[in-house]
């Protein structure tokens, strides 16, 4: 019999083992779709971003008008820009749901996969931040000023670090140029990290909703999960195009319709919605360095999750107390997101502080205690 090229060719063999003949658990639910959805998001963002970069000028005097020109005069430029801007929001929706799934089903016990995933999240956040600065509107400029300024809280080297990042004594042309270069580079870094993430995942195989070994009951990835993924793509791309076509500015800030002006500060400086939870944690601490540390901790705490797992069962499927705690955490994050979008005044200050304390308490204290308690209840 002639050899099957799909299984013998060095390159096709890798693709075959990752996407076609990959043994997958038969019972993985729709929550396992978000990995492939993130892949589609990344591909869409790179393609639309490349097309936008062809018409963009990374210069403070021209950036704003070059974006306006893209929307007015380039064939379908408005659509490409709207898909790119809202695609970022969908990217974050997918990654947050993906992390939530991993947390709920104990996928973090694959430590290497989880850690590369957290690094991917950090890289994505950096990419989104530098990208937000590029249209050079008011919120772009002031967002860049405020967030980069946080590095000045680092003792001894802080101020030097900020001036080095800015390329001067304020956010100006050198800053915009380097941010554009970084925004172009980072997505390819994300693509590289994704292959590492998948390599680690395929070492151990996928987890499943029961959290038990599924070696005795595996099915090929194709056609079952390829079809399921295509359904997922449709269900994500439909709301994305709907948003981009019907209300493209829904998630944006009206301040960004005004060109950047270093002499006028917007009344409320706030980042895009997907950073608001971390921004609320940053604002809830009255000390600058303390706020920066809390901001960093709010995301870096994910690295600790595998070490805080005390339960004998992997997933939360059969652990109702942990489930309750999990949904309290989700609600808490939604409260933080809402508080981050509000002005710094009573009652938002105290709500933000309480929600920040609750966030860290749930993750660092309540989850390990609950898991130990559940072990006792189940006579483990």
Curated annotation (Swiss-Prot):
- What Gene3D superfamilies does the record point to? Cytochrome Bc1 Complex, Chain C
What PROSITE patterns does the entry give? CYTB_CTER (PS51003), CYTB_NTER (PS51002)
Q: Where does heme b b566 bind?
A: 98, 197
Membrane-spanning ranges: 34-54, 78-99, 114-134, 179-199, 227-247, 289-309, 321-341, 348-368
Q: How does it sit in the membrane?
A: Multi-pass membrane protein
- SS bonds (residue pairs): none
- GO MF: metal ion binding; ubiquinol-cytochrome-c reductase activity
Any idea which positions bind a ubiquinone?
A: 202
- State the free-text cofactor note: Binds 2 heme b groups non-covalently.
Q: Which PANTHER family match?
A: CYTOCHROME B
Oligomeric state and interaction partners are given as:
The cytochrome bc1 complex contains 11 subunits: 3 respiratory subunits (MT-CYB, CYC1 and UQCRFS1), 2 core proteins (UQCRC1 and UQCRC2) and 6 low-molecular weight proteins (UQCRH/QCR6, UQCRB/QCR7, UQCRQ/QCR8, UQCR10/QCR9, UQCR11/QCR10 and a cleavage product of UQCRFS1). This cytochrome bc1 complex then forms a dimer.
Stated family? Belongs to the cytochrome b family.
The protein's role, per its UniProt record = Component of the ubiquinol-cytochrome c reductase complex (complex III or cytochrome b-c1 complex) that is part of the mitochondrial respiratory chain. The b-c1 complex mediates electron transfer from ubiquinol to cytochrome c. Contributes to the generation of a proton gradient across the mitochondrial membrane that is then used for ATP synthesis.
Tell me what this protein is called: Cytochrome b
Give the species: Pelecanoides georgicus
């Amino acid at each position: 019999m002639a050899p099957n090229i799909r299984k013998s060719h060095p390159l096709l063999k890798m693709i075959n083992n990752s996407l076609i003949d990959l043994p997958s658990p038969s019972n993985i639910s729709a929550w396992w779709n978000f990995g492939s959805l993130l892949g589609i998001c990344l591909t869409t963002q790179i393609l639309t971003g490349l097309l936008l970069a062809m018409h963009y000028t990374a210069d403070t005097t021209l950036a704003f008008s070059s974006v306006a020109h893209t929307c007015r005069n380039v064939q379908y430029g408005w659509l490409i820009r709207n898909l790119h801007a809202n695609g970022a929001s969908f990217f974050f929706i997918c990654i947050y749901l993906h992390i939530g799934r991993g947390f709920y089903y104990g996928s973090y016990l694959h430590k290497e996969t989880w850690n590369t995933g957290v690094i991917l999240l950090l890289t994505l956040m950096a990419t989104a931040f530098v990208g937000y600065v590029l249209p050079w509107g008011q919120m772009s400029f002031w967002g860049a000023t405020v967030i980069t300024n946080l590095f000045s809280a680092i003792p001894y080297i802080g101020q030097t670090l900020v001036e080095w990042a800015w390329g001067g004594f304020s956010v100006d042309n050198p800053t915009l140029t380097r941010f554009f270069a970084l925004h172009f580079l980072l997505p390819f870094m994300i693509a590289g990290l994704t292959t590492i993430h998948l390599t680690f995942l395929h070492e151990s195989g996928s987890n499943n909703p029961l959290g038990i070994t599924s070696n005795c009951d595996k099915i090929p990835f194709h056609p079952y999960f390829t079809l399921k993924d295509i359904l997922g793509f449709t269900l994500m791309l439909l709301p994305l195009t709907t948003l981009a076509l019907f209300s493209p500015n829904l998630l944006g800030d009206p301040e960004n319709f005004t060109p950047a002006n270093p002499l006028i500060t917007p009344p409320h400086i706030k980042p895009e919605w997907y950073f608001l939870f971390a921004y609320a944690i940053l604002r809830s601490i009255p000390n600058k360095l303390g706020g920066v540390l809390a901001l960093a901790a709010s995301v870096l705490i994910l690295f600790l999750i595998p070490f805080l797992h005390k339960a004998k069962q992997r997933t939360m499927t059969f652990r109702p107390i942990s489930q309750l705690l999990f949904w309290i955490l989700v609600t808490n994050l939604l409260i933080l997101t809402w508080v981050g979008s509000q002005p710094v005044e009573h009652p938002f200050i105290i709500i933000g502080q309480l929600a920040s304390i609750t966030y860290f308490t749930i993750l660092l204290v309540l989850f390990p205690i609950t898991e130990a308690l559940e072990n006792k209840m189940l006579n483990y």
